[in-house]
Amino acid sequence: MNRIEKIREYVDNVLLHMSDETERRCGYLHLYGVSQACALIALKRRENVELATIAGMLHDIYFYLTMDTKDHAHRGSVIAREILTSLQSFAGDEIDMICTAIHNHSSKGRKHSSFDEVLIDCRCFATLFI
């Protein structure tokens, strides 16, 4: 199983166990919508498409696990690090890239790395349509 599929399996498991059907549906649309946008923008900007796709899938995982928005970007980066480490499929620098992007995805007012900006831009873009 490739790495994106491993993450998709984890995300699907989280969403399938949500009791609120509307929130579950929104979760699928939002997480996978942002993920697809990340893949396209990363390709255009010559960033790592696979890691951007994964960052998009995991960027709001804390919210969908807890239904709590407080400090969700920071807390989500901690959970994402645990998930990625437990899969034993990612190098440390890849985990750092993904988790830093997740940590920064709600910080629209500051300049971040070009990789982080992919997730920030896609998340903003997705909120217009999803």
Feature-to-residue mapping (PLM):
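Metal-dependent phosphohydrolase cores
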Residues: 1-130
